[in-house]
């Protein structure tokens, strides 16, 4: 076999690999676009109706007064990805965890004994103030038709829930600050941070401040910088607003809130009641007008302007 023939075969193999790789990339992109189009929502749709198609058993537990909202995300460890959903509530809900700190799953039985030598055991308070919501990201699949033992559909991530409202607010602000710092650090190392200024001296100051802020975070931790410092650097270094980015991300693949939806049947009843009330009031006013004995007299009585000594007409 000649050298030229071997080179031609190798060139054909390289070309075939390029075509196969391009075709595989096209298929993967098409599959991803298909899954993305399935959850292409932005505050659209009635939450209970959407969950009814996914999990009819869970849809029966939804209450519109809770301000329910459903979010969808793509995830998984393999391709093509799976569609996950999670139910959020935007109104205050009173539950057992909010009213009492006890762990009711491990309450001891009642102990009654008159023997002082055998006192009851001291109640263990280690599990108190631990909140488990059982509301993680669940895959949209046929698993809800199976028993619960056949598959785990909930996430194993634990979230802390402190009894103090002030402490919960501080933790929420700290998490938001950590997200901003991680976002800024990732964009800094990827080279995506772009300064808004064009002056060389200003660019040097911005770059120096950004580098010093990231170094302070890496040396002293998150608590070594304030949130307003991170906001200042983000405002100077990037045209993309972090808060707008987070707000847009939360609205992506999200249904409408049940708090914004009104029942059509209830609206019809309200309209009919209002029309009946206003109709009766107008009818009563018209009847009282014609029942007045002076109505016809007042209709044809000439109206004159009375002059008094204090009048200023003609002066």
Swiss-Prot record:
Any one Gene Ontology cellular component term annotated for this protein: mitochondrial outer membrane
Compartments where located: Cytoplasm, Cytosol; Mitochondrion outer membrane
Superkingdom of source: Eukaryota
GO biological-process terms attached to the record: negative regulation of mitochondrial fission; negative regulation of protein targeting to mitochondrion
Keyword Cytoplasm: yes
Entry keyword set: Cytoplasm, Membrane, Mitochondrion, Mitochondrion outer membrane
Tissue: Enriched in the pancreatic beta cell and the testis and is expressed at low levels in other tissues tested.
Main location per the UniProt record: cytoplasm
Function, in words: Acts as an inhibitor of mitochondrial fission. Interacts with MFF and prevents DNM1L recruitment to mitochondria, promoting a more fused mitochondrial network.
Subunit organization: Can homodimerize. Interacts with MFF; the interaction inhibits MFF interaction with DNM1L.
Protein name: Protein MFI
Biological source species: Mus musculus
Record gene name: Mfi
